[in-house]
């Protein structure tokens, strides 16, 4: 058997990992500006944490979850999304306690798992960046969180991003709309896809979310959920729209957007961008005011979003965005002869401890091959160290571009490499 990675997974090699690290660092910096702190939850949870919160009838639970019984006969699932585990942690760790400053703002970056057909930007193990804000029902929380995602896209240079907005209203509004949708779709049941016929019985709002051609045709003239919002829900949605306009964040109302998870209420949103003629969702989220209570905590409003790192990086690449990744090395040591081996290690380690990136040859290659490595690493400075240099206690360091060089004692290298670097690179 040829040993390979499982279908739908990937190896992220150093060249690509640098791009991932850059995007993650921009996200962390952005979230910290909004007073978010990082949370890390287990990669696997008890099955009920996901099934009950995400919804027993959702595609995630019925088709996509990786679940199994462990050796203690516990029903376990690999996390398919980030919100439910964070809410579970919020309740379990009593972050609702009065001594904890509200709202509680948390972000996460990590692997998620769904069994689905692998395709561009969609894998069975994928990586998600997400945020969750607990404790504020104020519509300004909705808008601030949406604005934070918008701010992140601006920082990354992503273009042509459109905010799609909708409201699912209160549970009462949603129930009234659910019945209206059933009444509308039932006469055309036979025209729906098999999946949507099932959804009509279990979760009719999900028919609106279908990508099947026959379903899209069926819901074209479906009633709008916005016509079923109660007074409080209407006021919340109007406030969200007003504040988005105040922040100059353009949006479009999309009444067919319902999101794929059952726990949302009031504001839901997606950021969509066009890539090679296709519309791709880059980020999505919304409000969930009942989820904390569902996990046994006090009734606590919540709002959050998630975005897929693979898809985000694919969009960055397709839009031709060059990420400012530092790839240069400060110094490369070419080593000649066994007599220089120990001193080379001593010098390169001393240089690193002064805050510089450094590498040396370990393979005993010819000098030409070592210089080629220095070029590959984009080394700014190159030093050649042989047995004669070790005996003299000094060596020549040269600027790898200008070829300017200077002879430097080992003592200076080990204690004041910053001055040497500045002298050669200025």
From Swiss-Prot:
One of its GO terms (molecular function) is histidine-tRNA ligase activity. GO terms for biological process: histidyl-tRNA aminoacylation. It is an enzyme of class 6 (ligase). InterPro entries: aa-tRNA-synth_II (IPR006195), aa-tRNA-synth_II/BPL/LPL (IPR045864), Anticodon-bd (IPR004154), Anticodon-bd_dom_sf (IPR036621), His-tRNA-ligase (IPR015807), HisRS-like_core (IPR041715), HisRS/HisZ (IPR004516), HisRS_anticodon (IPR033656). SUPFAM superfamilies: Class II aaRS ABD-related, Class II aaRS and biotin synthetases. Keywords: Aminoacyl-tRNA synthetase, ATP-binding, Cytoplasm, Ligase, Nucleotide-binding, Protein biosynthesis. It catalyses: tRNA(His) + L-histidine + ATP = L-histidyl-tRNA(His) + AMP + diphosphate + H(+). Its main location: cytoplasm. GO terms for cellular component: cytoplasm. It is found in: Cytoplasm. Signal peptide: none annotated. It comes from the Bacteria. Its EC number is 6.1.1.21. Homodimer. Belongs to the class-II aminoacyl-tRNA synthetase family. PANTHER family: HISTIDINE--TRNA LIGASE, MITOCHONDRIAL-RELATED (PTHR43707:SF1), HISTIDYL-TRNA SYNTHETASE (PTHR43707). This is Histidine--tRNA ligase.
């Amino acid at each position: 058997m040829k040993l390979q990675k499982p279908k739908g997974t990937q190896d992220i090699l150093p060249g690509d990992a640098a791009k991932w690290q850059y995007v993650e660092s921009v996200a962390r910096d952005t979230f910290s500006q909004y007073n978010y702190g990082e949370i890390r939850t287990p990669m696997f949870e008890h099955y009920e944490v996901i099934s009950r919160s995400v919804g027993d009838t959702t595609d995630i639970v019925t088709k996509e979850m990786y679940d199994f019984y462990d050796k203690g006969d516990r029903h376990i699932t690999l996390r398919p999304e980030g919100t439910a585990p964070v809410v579970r942690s919020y309740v379990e760790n009593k972050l609702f306690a009065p001594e904890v400053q509200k709202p509680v703002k948390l972000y996460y970056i990590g692997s998620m798992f769904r069994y689905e057909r692998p395709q561009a930007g969609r894998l069975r193990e994928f990586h998600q960046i997400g945020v969750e804000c607990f404790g504020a029902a104020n519509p300004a929380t909705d808008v601030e969180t949406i604005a934070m995602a918008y701010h992140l896209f601006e920082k990354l240079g992503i273009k042509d991003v459109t905010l799609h907005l909708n409201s699912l209203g209160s549970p009462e509004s949603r129930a009234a709309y659910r019945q209206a949708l059933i009444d509308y779709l039932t006469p055309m049941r036979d025209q729906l896809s098999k999946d949507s016929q099932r959804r009509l019985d279990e979760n009719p709002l999900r028919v609106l979310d279908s990508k099947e051609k026959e379903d899209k045709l069926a819901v074209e003239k479906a009633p709008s959920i916005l016509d079923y919002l109660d007074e409080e829900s209407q006021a919340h949605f109007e406030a969200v729209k007003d504040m988005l306009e105040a922040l100059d964040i353009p949006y479009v109302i999309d009444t067919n957007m319902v999101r794929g998870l059952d726990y949302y209420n009031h504001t839901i949103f997606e950021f969509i961008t066009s890539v090679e003629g296709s519309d791709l969702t880059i980020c999505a989220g919304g409000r969930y005011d009942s989820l904390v209570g569902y996990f046994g905590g006090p009734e606590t409003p919540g709002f959050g979003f998630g975005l897929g790192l693979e898809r985000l990086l694919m969009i960055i690449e397709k839009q031709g965005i060059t990420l400012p990744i530092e790839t240069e090395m400060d110094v490369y040591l070419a080593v000649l002869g066994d007599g220089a081996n120990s001193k080379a290690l001593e010098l390169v380690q001393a240089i690193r401890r002064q805050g510089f990136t450094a590498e040396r040859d370990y393979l005993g290659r010819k000098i030409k091959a070592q210089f080629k490595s220095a070029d590959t690493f984009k080394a700014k400075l190159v030093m050649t160290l042989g047995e004669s240099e070790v005996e003299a206690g000094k060596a020549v360091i040269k600027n790898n571009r200008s070829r300017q060089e200077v002879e430097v004692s080992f003592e200076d290298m080990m204690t004041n490499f910053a001055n040497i670097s500045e002298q050669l690179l200025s």
